[in-house]
């Protein structure tokens, strides 16, 4: 490879073995870090070096300083939770360390899992990107939140019974919004989460793309409820 000195790459295999390489001709600051083989700290590498480790590989070039990659590595190593959330936290930490010398413009997040896409139709568990924005990491975080809302299943901790108070919050929407249908979601107030109300709420949620969070057991996803009400409040 005659262009080896201009390249930078990081890899982690299915067994957690990590490697990072930074070419000699990459622009300063340039380098990478991988998780330590003994799971304590991380291993740093500079230009012309291949470094080997475990669990993650973080690398960058044209950075303000090495603090960007240092922050990313430390954030990922210390964080818990889902992989998308940990990667998002690492991006934020990296930017807080200085980021790109040229400023901010774009950001992307790709997480692949077998059958992890919508309804298992593909392997793109998360595939979002921001091409041009004043604060691309903040915008990426907003898009990740939307992606999780519409494509991730309900967290059982977010379930709550549909009380008469919640029915009163949702019925005006179901009674007034046709959303392109020949009739409203509800034709008359129900006052309680009976079968008629639940069927109307189900159809409404499918229409609004909350497909993976639809339920018919008298409970509602708190995150969905908050999103529905926030959208209507913003529209008035």
Residue spans of the language-model regions?
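N-terminal nucleophile
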Residues: 1-164
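Short acidic, glycine/serine/threonine-rich helix-capping segments at coil-helix boundaries
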Residues: 156-236
């Amino acid at each position: 490879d005659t262009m080896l000195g201009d390249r930078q790459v990081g890899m982690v295999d299915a067994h957690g073995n990590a490697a990072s390489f930074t070419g000699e001709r990459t622009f300063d600051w340039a380098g990478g870090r991988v998780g330590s083989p003994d799971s304590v700290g991380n291993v740093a590498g500079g230009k012309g070096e291949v470094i080997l480790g475990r669990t993650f590989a973080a690398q960058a070039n044209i950075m303000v300083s090495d603090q960007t990659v240092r922050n990313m590595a430390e954030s990922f190593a210390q964080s818990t939770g889902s992989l998308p959330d940990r990667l998002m936290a690492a991006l934020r930490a990296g930017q807080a360390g200085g980021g790109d010398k040229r400023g901010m413009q774009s950001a992307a997040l790709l997480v692949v899992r077998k059958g992890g896409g919508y309804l298992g139709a593909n392997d793109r568990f998360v595939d979002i990107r921001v091409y041009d924005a004043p604060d691309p990491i903040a915008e990426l975080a907003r898009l990740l939140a939307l992606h999780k809302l519409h494509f991730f299943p309900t967290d059982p901790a977010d379930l709550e019974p549909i009380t008469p108070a919640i029915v009163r919050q949702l019925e005006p929407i179901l009674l007034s919004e046709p959303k392109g249908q020949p009739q409203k979601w509800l034709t008359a107030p129900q006052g309680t989460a009976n079968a008629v109300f639940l069927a109307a709420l189900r159809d409404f949620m499918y229409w609004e793309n909350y497909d993976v969070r639809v339920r018919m057991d008298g409970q509602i996803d708190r995150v969905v409820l908050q999103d529905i009400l926030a959208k209507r409040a913003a529209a008035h």
